[in-house]
Structure formats: C-alpha cells, structure tokens
C-alpha cells in the first residue's frame, strides 16, 4: 500500500514541476508593465527587464503614424518608436493620406524592413499551404520541392532568378503582392519591386543580384531570421526609417541603405544662403553610400544590440 502511495506522490511531484517550469517567465513578469512597443523578458540572472517587442502579430489593421508613415498595425508603430527611440503616436486609423504637394522635400518611395519582412512572411505562408504529406500510396510534396517547382517555372534557363523573374513569382499570389503603403497605385507597384530587391539582397551571397536555387531556398527558409540593418553616416548609425536632408532632397534609411529623392533645387527651396552645385550634391549622396561599408562591418554587432 505504501509503495503505491509513494509512486503516486512521485508522479504528482513530477507533474507539478513540469507545470511550473514553462510558467517561470510568466511568474517573473506577472507584475511588470513595459508599455506600448515593449515586452517583458527574463535576464540570465532571472530578473525581469523590458525590451522592444521582437515580433508583432501579423494581423492587418493599418494606422498612420504622427511621422507620416503607414504601419501594418498599432504594434508595429509602437515597436518602431521603441527601436528608433523616437516618439510616434497614432495620427489616425488607415493608410496615411498622400499629401498632394509640389514640395520637393517629400520622402522617396522605399521598402522598409517591415514591408520586406511582411512580403516574405506572406510568401512563406502561401508556400507552406502547398505542402502535401506523403500518403499510403502516393508521394507528397515537401517545402523544398515546392520551392524547386516555382524556381524552375520562372527561371529563364540560367539556373538563377533575377529581380524580374522573382517579381513574376511573387505576383502569382494575390495576398503576397497586396502590400499597400501608399495611396497611389503606381507607388505601390514600385514598392513591390523594391521589396523584391530587398528580399534578393537577403541571401545574395555573391552580390550579383540573382539568386541560385540554394540562395532562393535560404531567402524563403521559415527558420531564417532576417537581420535588422542600420544606415551609417558620420560615425553614427541610424535605424530603418531614419531621415536626413540634402538641400531640398530627403534621404531615408531603408534596409541598410540611404535612398534619396532627386529633385532640382531652386532658390526658394534652398536653406538660407547656402548653395551647392550638382557635383557637391552628388558627392554628398555618395558619401552617404560610402558609409554603408561601416554598417556592413558592424552588422553583427548592431543586430546583437537590437
């Protein structure tokens, strides 16, 4: 009788211990409030700390931020504010209304990392839905085989996918291509192409702007976590979405690169009495791009810091 009681006690203790282990984080963070855009995490010492949210849920409920940028949802807005250390509030629900202005300081059309990652998430979701398990008498299709099928369908015979071929592949899925950040449809088409280029850059190991099958496989590998790249300028690093100005032109940090408008500045748009020749302006933009070497060298450090 006592042996039976001892066995039951051991089972009960094991079950209680098993239930407590996964709840340890929730217990530590139970009374911790981190605020919008942040979440509670547990340090190596077992203490609670607040960090920027690692990944927001992908539900689509666009909001316009006070910075004039459209976000997929409230969480993405507050996460961006946390990562950039800036104060961003919800201006109104829905996409930001495009300002019909002739002002040359308007921001260039760019693919932000959030846009790139959202396109990638939708592609992976679509491809995973096509997986067919092996049956009793039939062979199914695994993830690699599905990617191989699409790769061969859009490859022109050189065993690589360039940006136009990759774009044709993306356009096979209505959900994937429906990334709408701008009110103007032409800008959204441009955004789609820019995000395809950003996806190619993720796994283009030899920098030829084409993907071999292995690079294509890495790009859309569900377990691959794209790094968050920053832009460098004058010994400083800037988060995705940061902006700077060159005369009447605006430059935006997008996926680790500075992207600038190309407006011709007249006397009314220039600041103060400063004048710059086209050569000086071109040189400044080249200076922005030159600093990307520094950003690439510190890529791993920056990723860890985030």
Swiss-Prot record:
Q: Which GO terms describe its molecular function?
A: calcium ion binding; heparin binding
The primary location reported for this protein is: secreted
Reading the lineage from the top rank, the first entry is: Eukaryota
Location of Phosphoserine modifications = 163
Key word Disulfide bond present: yes
UniProt-listed Pfam families: EF-hand_FSTL1, FOLN, Kazal_2, VWF
Record domain EF-hand: where: 142-176, 191-226
Residue ranges of domain Kazal-like in the record: 46-98
Gene Ontology cellular-component terms for this entry are: extracellular space
Q: What residues bear carbohydrate chains?
A: 142, 173, 178
Q: Where is the signal peptide?
A: 1-18
Question: What keyword terms does UniProt attach to this protein?
Answer: Disulfide bond, Glycoprotein, Heparin-binding, Phosphoprotein, Repeat, Secreted, Signal
Q: Quick one: a GO biological-process term for this protein?
A: negative regulation of apoptotic process
SUPFAM superfamilies named in the record: EF-hand, FnI-like domain, Kazal-type serine protease inhibitors
Q: Where is the VWFC domain?
A: 231-285
Note the coiled coil stretches, chain numbering. none
Q: List the disulfide bonds.
A: 29-40, 34-50, 52-82, 56-75, 64-96
Q: Where in the cell is it found?
A: Secreted
Q: What does the UniProt record say this protein does?
A: Secreted glycoprotein that is involved in various physiological processes, such as angiogenesis, regulation of the immune response, cell proliferation and differentiation. Plays a role in the development of the central nervous system, skeletal system, lungs, and ureter. Promotes endothelial cell survival, migration and differentiation into network structures in an AKT-dependent manner. Also promotes survival of cardiac myocytes. Initiates various signaling cascades by activating different receptors on the cell surface such as DIP2A, TLR4 or BMP receptors.
Which protein are we looking at? Follistatin-related protein 1
Instruction: Kindly list the organism's lineage.
Output: Eukaryota, Metazoa, Chordata, Craniata, Vertebrata
């Amino acid at each position: 009788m006592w042996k039976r009681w001892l066995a039951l006690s051991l089972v009960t203790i094991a079950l209680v211990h098993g239930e407590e282990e996964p709840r340890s984080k929730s217990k530590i963070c139970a009374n911790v409030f981190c605020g919008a855009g942040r979440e509670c995490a547990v340090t190596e010492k077992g203490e609670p700390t607040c960090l920027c949210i690692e990944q927001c849920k992908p539900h689509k409920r666009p909001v316009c931020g006070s910075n004039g940028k459209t976000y997929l949802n409230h969480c993405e807005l507050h996460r961006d504010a946390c990562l950039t250390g800036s104060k961003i509030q919800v201006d109104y629900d829905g996409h930001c209304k495009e300002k019909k202005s002739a002002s040359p300081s308007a921001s260039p059309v760019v693919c932000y990392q959030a846009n790139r990652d959202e396109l990638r998430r939708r592609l992976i979701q679509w491809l995973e839905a096509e997986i067919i398990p092996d049956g009793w008498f039939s062979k199914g299709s695994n993830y690699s085989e599905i990617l191989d099928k699409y790769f061969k369908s859009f490859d022109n015979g050189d065993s690589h996918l360039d940006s136009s071929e990759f774009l044709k592949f993306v356009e096979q899925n209505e959900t994937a291509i429906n990334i709408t950040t701008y009110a103007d449809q032409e800008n959204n088409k441009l955004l789609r192409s820019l995000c395809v280029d950003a996806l190619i850059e993720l796994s283009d190991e030899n920098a030829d702007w084409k993907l071999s099958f292995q690079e294509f496989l890495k790009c859309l590998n569900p377990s691959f976590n794209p790094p968050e790249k920053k832009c460098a300028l004058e010994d400083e690093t800037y988060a995705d979405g940061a902006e700077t100005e060159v005369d009447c032109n605006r430059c935006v940090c997008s996926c680790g690169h500075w992207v600038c408008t190309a407006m011709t500045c007249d006397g009314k748009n220039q600041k103060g009495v400063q004048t710059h020749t086209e050569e000086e302006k071109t040189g400044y933009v080249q200076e922005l791009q030159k600093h990307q070497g520094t950003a690439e060298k510190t890529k791993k450090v920056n990723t860890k810091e985030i």
